[in-house]
Amino acid sequence: MKAHDAMRTKHTHTVTRDRVGHPRRVDPGRLSPDREAPAGVGDRELLVLPVLWQLEISHYNEKVRWALDYKHIPHIRRSLLPGLHAVKTRRLTGDTSTTPALTLDGRSNGDSTRIIAAIEERWPQPRLYPEDPAQRRRALELEDFFDEELGPHIRRAFYYELLPHPELVVPLFTQGRRRAPRALLRAAFPVLRVAMRQRFEIDADSAAHSRAKMVAAMDRLEREISASGYLVGDSFTVADLTAAALFYGVARPPEFPYPMVAVNDLPDSWREFLHSLQRRPGGQWLAQMYRQHRCQSAELTPARAR
């Protein structure tokens, strides 16, 4: 979700090291809404840059953004308006109406796990898949667990709490957009809310079930944290990335690259539930993963492409 109006500026990039020693770009405006491609990036290079089609607040989108940023892969992000995004992603991928979708070498993929697999094959360093075959299988198993057993449930529980509050959801969905898209979504929100409740099967019973699944996923996370501090082996892998990205709405880390609903504006019951998870060892681990491994943004936004 991003179409920002802020003035674009050019930034000078230097190379430093992150907390785990990986080289990374340092950009004074790393979370700037609009970053132009730096001098020396021409039209031909822009044409072959990966393009991420995203909804900014989606946890599955955060999973792919994190992978791109962790590997320092220059890319362009195109944020879509919720509700209308399905038309674009289905046209791109031919088989899915969801985000994220990544266009790479002229082909688009619409599944976060397949996207990371393609990224890992194309840009293997720094690794997200362990070299050891057994550890690699374990990391992929945990990625699948959090994708399937956490992702849908945290989304359902979140929207159950927030959809009754258009004064919170509409600004969240349209942050940085011009007046016309904001007005469009505000007018269409009652219809969008009904559609989302139907699509994600959102009601009081399903939301209570999803809260329980979130607690179960936190239980599993805490059991899986090894003496090294990671889920698999002694380094950061796709398992850690997936768990942390999909739980970002619980951790609410300052490193998350887009604004969230202010904690004091959240419904009381949801805020208290989040706090109960944040205080757990797993909640502290999530914050640590963001502090240590949520690298600076590798997004490039060329003015001429907007």
What are these regions (language model features)?
Residues A134, R138-E141, H209-A216, R220, ...:
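A non-catalytic, amphipathic alpha-helix used as a structural packing/dimerization or gating element
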Residues V194-I202, G282-R306:
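Long, charge-rich low-complexity segments
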Residues H11-H13, D18, H22, D27, ...:
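Intrinsic-disorder-associated, low-complexity terminal segments enriched in Asp/Asn/His/Tyr and depleted
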Residues G151-V261:
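GST-like fold's C-terminal all-alpha helical module
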Residues H4-D5:
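Acidic/polar hotspots within intrinsically disordered regions
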Residues L246-Q296:
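Short His-centered aromatic/hydrophobic patch
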